[in-house]
């Protein structure tokens, strides 16, 4: 059988659900043609391949390329001054209510050119790519006007043209009330009637998100945005239950959301509803750490009900200025007590599920895109165990 590239003498963590645990294969081979995997499994079970190029992995471990399924990479400015205010005792909510927080980034983002937004985002993206990330989700939400949201989403799309990485984009118009607007209902009307339909028609977004929280939007307002997204044919996801329990997890489940994210205050009913709906719990330990939260997401409830768990950086200027998915692995284990298997699945298979891309990403299986990360490690647990450590040997996207 013909193939373009063949990686042999490798150990595989396939993350395939057809295999137990991490889907480990001690003597493995991966064959790819036209960017997709033809075979990923034991050498003894592989067909005879005639490869244009053969790569000896010398016993290294191969995982699926890593997926960062929740980021805000496109923004202007920074929020270092707010960091100092928090160190002096101000809370995230106090800063937001005083006109800082998201709104301060909105001002900086609107003032930046699209080229400047791309340049800043590329620096952050490059840090993720250097650790084996092959797919990244990028949200808007720092424009909060049709023109500025368009510019942010165009900038996000350009990242995929500038770098060898798959970029999925999410319209987060319902992130905060913009500084020029005082009427929440009127702003939600504008999102639903003007912004979201235009962005959907222009193909700038793959999904729609909202921030359902006391300092942002209510469940009723969020539901209006989700109904408009459904009318536009776009899937939804939700920033939910981060600072309080407004029933965001259950709301996300009611709309069949791809994911609900943060979830520190989610209750058992929310966890059960998410499991029933197939909504992935995306946990964001970087934000938990950075704003010094104390309430841990209910991981035991997610396990009990079979809710899938993913991990992501939540890279953003205010609450998680983090561009290391490897550090997120360690944080997920140490802060949230996730297992090694849950952590590694959370940045591969379950992250793909959270983006609605499990059919072609997230595991090493025939038919999926050949996105690989090759590591200089003795065992996969090292990726979770060590900090400040990047053992990436090679990163392959679409077989190249």
Swiss-Prot record:
Amino acids binding 4-imidazolone-5-propanoate: 79, 142, 175, 242, 319
Residues that coordinate or bind Fe(3+): 70, 72, 239, 314
A GO MF term: imidazolonepropionase activity
CDD domains with a match to the protein in the record: Imidazolone-5PH (cd01296)
A GO cellular-component term linked to this record: cytoplasm
One GO process term, biological-process aspect: L-histidine catabolic process to glutamate and formamide
Pathway participation: Amino-acid degradation; L-histidine degradation into L-glutamate; N-formimidoyl-L-glutamate from L-histidine: step 3/3
UniProt entry keywords in alphabetical sequence: Cytoplasm, Histidine metabolism, Hydrolase, Iron, Metal-binding, Zinc
Cofactor dependence: Zn(2+); Fe(3+)
Annotated Zn(2+) binding sites: 70, 72, 239, 314
One Pfam family cited in the UniProt record for this chain: Amidohydro_1
E.C. numbers: 3.5.2.7
Residues annotated as signal peptide: none
Alphabetized InterPro entries for the sequence: Amidohydro-rel, HutI, Metal-dep_hydrolase_composite, Metal_Hydrolase
Entry's cofactor comment: Binds 1 zinc or iron ion per subunit.
Catalytic activity: 4-imidazolone-5-propanoate + H2O = N-formimidoyl-L-glutamate
Location in or out of the cell: Cytoplasm
Source organism superkingdom: Bacteria
Positions with a binding annotation for N-formimidoyl-L-glutamate: 142, 316, 318
Function, as annotated: Catalyzes the hydrolytic cleavage of the carbon-nitrogen bond in imidazolone-5-propanoate to yield N-formimidoyl-L-glutamate. It is the third step in the universal histidine degradation pathway.
Family affiliation: Belongs to the metallo-dependent hydrolases superfamily. HutI family.
Name of the protein this chain belongs to: Imidazolonepropionase
Organism: Methylobacterium nodulans (strain LMG 21967 / CNCM I-2342 / ORS 2060)
Gene field: hutI
């Amino acid at each position: 059988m013909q193939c373009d590239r063949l990686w042999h003498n490798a150990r595989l963590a396939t993350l395939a659900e057809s295999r137990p645990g991490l889907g480990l294969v001690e003597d493995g081979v991966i064959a790819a043609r036209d960017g997709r995997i033809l075979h990923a499994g034991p050498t003894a079970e592989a067909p005879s391949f005639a490869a244009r190029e053969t790569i000896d992995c010398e016993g290294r471990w191969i995982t699926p390329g890593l997926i960062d399924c929740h980021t805000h990479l496109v923004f202007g400015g920074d929020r270092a001054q707010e960091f100092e205010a928090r160190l002096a005792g101000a809370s995230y909510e106090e800063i937001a209510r005083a006109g800082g927080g998201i709104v301060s980034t909105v001002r900086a983002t609107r003032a930046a050119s699209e080229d400047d937004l791309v340049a800043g985002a590329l620096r952050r993206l490059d840090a993720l790519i250097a650790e084996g990330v092959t797919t990244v989700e990028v949200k808007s939400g720092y424009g909060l006007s049709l023109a500025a949201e368009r510019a942010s989403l165009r900038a996000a799309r350009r990242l995929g043209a500038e770098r060898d990485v798959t970029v999925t984009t999410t319209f987060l118009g319902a992130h905060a009330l913009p500084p020029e607007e005082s009427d929440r209902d009127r702003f939600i009307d504008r999102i639903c009637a003007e912004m979201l339909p235009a962005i959907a028609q222009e193909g700038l977004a793959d999904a729609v998100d909202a921030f359902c929280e006391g300092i942002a939007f209510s469940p009723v307002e969020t539901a209006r945005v989700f109904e408009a997204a459904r009318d536009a044919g776009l899937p939804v996801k939700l920033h939910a239950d981060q600072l309080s329990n407004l029933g965001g997890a259950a709301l996300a489940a009611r709309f069949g959301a791809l994911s609900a994210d943060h979830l520190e205050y989610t209750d058992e009913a929310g966890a059960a509803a998410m499991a029933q709906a197939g909504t992935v719990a995306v946990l964001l330990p970087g934000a938990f750490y950075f704003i010094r939260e104390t309430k841990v997401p209910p991981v035991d409830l997610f396990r009990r009900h079979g809710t899938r768990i993913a991990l992501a950086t939540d890279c953003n200027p205010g609450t998680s200025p983090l561009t290391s998915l490897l550090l997120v692995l360690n944080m997920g284990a140490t802060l949230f007590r996730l297992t090694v298997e849950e952590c590694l699945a959370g940045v591969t298979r379950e992250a793909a599920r959270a983006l609605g891309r499990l059919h072609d990403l997230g595991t090493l299986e025939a038919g999926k895109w050949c996105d690989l990360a090759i590591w200089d490690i003795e065992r996969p647990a090292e990726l979770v165990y060590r900090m400040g450590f990047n053992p990436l040997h090679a990163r392959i996207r679409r077989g190249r």
